[in-house]
Amino acid sequence: MSAFIVLGAQWGDEGKGKMTDYLAENADVVVRFQGGNNAGHTVVVGEKEYKLHLIPSGILYNDKLNVIGNGVVLDPKALFEEINYLESLGVEITPDRLIISDRAHVIMPYHRVLDGIKERARGNKDIGTTGKGIGPSYTDKMERSGIRVCDLIHKEVFEENLKETLEVKNKIITEVFGEEALDYDEIYNEYLGYAEKLRPFVKDISVIVNKKIKDGKEVLFEGAQGTLLDIDYGTYPYVTSSSTIAGGVCIGAGVGPTAITNAVGIAKAYTTRVGKGPFPTELLDSTGDWVREKGHEFGVTTGRARRCGWLDLVILKTSARVSGLTSFAVTKIDTLAGLDTLKVCTGYRLNGEIIDYVPASLEDLAKCKPIYEEFQGWDDSIANARCYKDLPENAIKYLKKIEDFTETKVSIVSVGPKRDQTMIISEI
């Protein structure tokens, strides 16, 4: 394979960082194609733990080119904080190892301010945004009033764009919401500093990535969030503001669909989500609490406790369909060790009918009652498995159910956070 996608098949937090890190060993290029610093990946290498938000997971290898694509919204302040954090851990960040799309849109201070103001204004109908300005930045992109990286590094263009945009934003901030206006000079000077630091990293990434593919290099596209947070196919409006499915690669990295050879969906052996929105298999009991504590289900970016529930195969089937997944990588199957009985959702009961897809209507999804199939559990020895035959028989049956229901093979299984606790069980 020369170009393949790794993306979340649920509501995010599936272990994409670990899987990308694992698969990046054989890749030449790792590309982040959407989202912003609202995403959080945790990667464990040896005894060290790395928390990534913007920079692709391939940065932990010395011989990979890492790319932030045009589909990403870039907060320069957050980027350089992450670079400083990684360098403090001994990871070298240079323009030879990291490049940034000149077409990526820039998150500005007014995006963060408006994100917080609007979320507070929603009251008990809040969406659960991270408050990092992601949505407002994508809004400006669609309204054609955003500032791109290529604009930021051209002083005169940035000066003109900032004046025009800030005038409008300050009217909204002061006249609509009654908050204090932002200072032009303060923003201008701060971001000019970022521009000079960014300049060496800025490239036309579409040209570079497509040439790598043409030259037969291995290119891995790393998604953030998950399918059920996709702006079109997620549980709208409790979604992110970008396209998290496989199709997002084409617009977020500037490659054609025929360039993609494989798409791997990352799925936990159970289901989690952060924030509000329907969750058919949610466990609101001691079992849910047990899974949360054992699985350390707290957000990397926000620290918020994740809601936990049984594995929902309807969601995985939907993910396989909308992204054309060629296989699944199943993570955290070790977390379920110790439970005598496990449940797996194989359908929803809605208005007297049984369905096997995620309905578009939020109201309909909230009415869906999960239909469960039960499986026998396994013990903690699963964490010591290093190949398929080492897995407990009941775990193998569990994985087989995923394959049969979704009509998509399981190619990778993870039984712990470390690199050596990952096994490839079939061709990716």
From Swiss-Prot:
Positions annotated to bind Mg(2+): D13, G40
EC number(s) reported in the record: 6.3.4.4
Cited Pfam families: Adenylsucc_synt
Residues that, per the record, bind substrate: V300, T301, T302, G303, R304, A305, R306
Gene3D superfamilies in the cross-refs: Adenylosuccinate Synthetase, subunit A, domain 1 (3.40.440.10), Adenylosuccinate Synthetase, subunit A, domain 2 (1.10.300.10), Adenylosuccinate Synthetase, subunit A, domain 3 (3.90.170.10)
Keyword vocabulary terms for this entry: Cytoplasm, GTP-binding, Ligase, Magnesium, Metal-binding, Nucleotide-binding, Purine biosynthesis
Annotated GTP binding sites: 12-18, 40-42, 306, 332-334, 414-416
SUPFAM superfamilies reported in the protein's UniProt record: P-loop containing nucleoside triphosphate hydrolases (SSF52540)
UniProt cofactor(s): Mg(2+)
Cofactor note: Binds 1 Mg(2+) ion per subunit.
Location in or out of the cell: Cytoplasm
Top enzyme category: ligase
One GO CC annotation: cytoplasm
MF annotations from Gene Ontology: adenylosuccinate synthase activity; GTP binding; magnesium ion binding
Superkingdom: Bacteria
Residues the record lists as binding IMP: D13, E14, G15, K16, N38, A39, G40, H41, T130, R144, Q225, T240, R304
GO biological process: 'de novo' AMP biosynthetic process; IMP metabolic process
UniProt xrefs under HAMAP family: Adenylosucc_synth (MF_00011)
PANTHER family in UniProt: ADENYLOSUCCINATE SYNTHETASE
Binding partners and assembly: Homodimer.
Family statement: Belongs to the adenylosuccinate synthetase family.
Known role: Plays an important role in the de novo pathway of purine nucleotide biosynthesis. Catalyzes the first committed step in the biosynthesis of AMP from IMP.
Protein name (Swiss-Prot/TrEMBL): Adenylosuccinate synthetase
Organism: Clostridium botulinum (strain 657 / Type Ba4)
Originating gene: purA
